[in-house]
């Protein structure tokens, strides 16, 4: 139609905006430069990057340009450029996450992705599903709904905060499987503790029983390095506005090709070929500039390096975790083994409730966290980010030590 797809609108790459030869920078210098890419609130130390990762300025500037272009073209873009752009974006995202683009669709968040599967699965009366008490509430709610709607039995397990080994976790789920079990939902990373579960082993076990595995990877894409297909799960959902740091409202859903035909979409699509995954992602008109910016977020992460980011996030978590372990009245609710967590952790106090702890951290020390007080997890989730400094964590460490000595 004469106008090129929007992805070609701005020829300036993220790398050209940043102009940083990372190989010539000392590690501390590199992370100071990364910190400069963020507009940070001056009134508090942000240790709650779990809900939403704020978008770095290089990505944000591209997002604003995409908004301007979509607004300029209006309906022309929506009718003639949107679909080609979506294909390009999906292909790049699939390449990064390690799966075929024909098995991936862009959604708005993890809840949408996983609930599409839970609600769209062809349940029958008497079927059985398993998930954990530590799973995200929205998905637990959806399992409760299908239990009522289709008379499905649902069993909840409780994942230990400090497992002895992988086999303890695998056996926990295996012990609840029956001849009626159709699906296990499991967190790749438990959102309230940061614990990374042995997904490949869980999938291998479940598949021996003919049970499918739905993986909640809300906190994993852009957080640490892995391939979705190598997990051998049946379904995988994630939020891209978390650790990939896209603007709010971007997620993904992966479905193994053989399962696509049996899943009913939430909203009907004109695509009638049951083997096409695109039929699962119809939502009507939505903010397309967010989708477009996924490419820019991928470019920014490519500049940073996923291995380098993973190493930094794990370093930050271990920095405060090791400083607070074996301290009186302090409870660490996240495993210490390096492969069992990355950037997210959880710490509690025996002498103070989680809600009071979060309140005092904010009011007395200017530290923003979130209280967790359920499912055998009692503490504050601590989620630093690539912009977090060790000096900020020192403030947090000193604050927790001080609070552990209070009598309330």
Regions of interest found by a model, annotated:
Residues 2-408:
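Pyridoxal 5′-phosphate
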């Amino acid at each position: 139609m004469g106008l090129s797809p929007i992805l070609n609108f701005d020829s300036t790459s993220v790398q050209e905006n940043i102009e940083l030869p990372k190989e010539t920078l000392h590690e501390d210098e590199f992370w100071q430069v990364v910190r400069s890419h963020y507009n940070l609130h001056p009134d508090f130390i942000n240790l709650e990057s779990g809900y939403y990762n704020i978008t770095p300025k290089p990505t944000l500037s591209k997002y604003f340009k995409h908004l301007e272009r979509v607004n300029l073209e209006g309906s022309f873009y929506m009718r003639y450029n949107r679909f080609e752009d979506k294909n390009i974006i999906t292909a790049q995202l699939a390449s990064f996450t390690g799966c075929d683009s024909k098995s991936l669709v862009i959604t708005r968040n993890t809840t949408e992705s996983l609930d599409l599967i839970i609600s769209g699965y062809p349940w029958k009366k008497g079927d059985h599903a398993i998930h954990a008490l530590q799973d995200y509430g929205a998905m637990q709610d959806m399992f409760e709904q299908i239990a009522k709607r289709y008379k499905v039995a649902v069993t909840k397990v409780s994942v230990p905060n400090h497992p002895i080994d992988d086999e303890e976790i695998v056996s926990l789920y295996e012990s609840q499987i029956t001849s009626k079990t159709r699906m296990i939902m499991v967190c790749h990373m438990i959102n309230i503790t940061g614990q990374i579960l042995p997904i490949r082993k869980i999938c291998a076990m479940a598949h021996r029983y003919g049970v499918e595995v739905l993986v909640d990877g809300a906190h994993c894409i852009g957080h640490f390095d892995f391939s979705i297909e190598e997990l051998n799960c049946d379904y995988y959902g994630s939020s891209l506005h978390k650790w990939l740091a896209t603007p709010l409202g971007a997620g993904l859903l992966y479905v193994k090709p053989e399962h696509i035909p049996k899943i009913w979409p939430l909203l009907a699509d004109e695509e009638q070929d049951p083997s096409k995954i695109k039929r699962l992602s119809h939502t009507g008109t939505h903010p397309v500039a967010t989708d477009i910016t996924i490419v820019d977020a991928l470019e920014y992460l490519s500049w940073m390096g996923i291995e380098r980011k993973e190493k930094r996030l794990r370093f930050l978590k271990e920095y405060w975790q090791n400083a607070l372990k074996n301290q009186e009245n302090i409870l660490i609710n996240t495993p210490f083994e390096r492969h069992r967590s990355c950037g997210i952790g959880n710490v509690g106090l025996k002498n103070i409730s989680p809600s009071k702890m979060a309140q005092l951290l904010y009011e007395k020390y200017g530290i923003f966290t979130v209280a967790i007080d359920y499912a055998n997890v009692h503490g504050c989730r601590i989620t630093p980010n690539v912009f977090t400094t060790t000096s900020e964590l020192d403030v947090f460490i000193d604050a927790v030590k001080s609070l552990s000595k209070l009598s309330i």
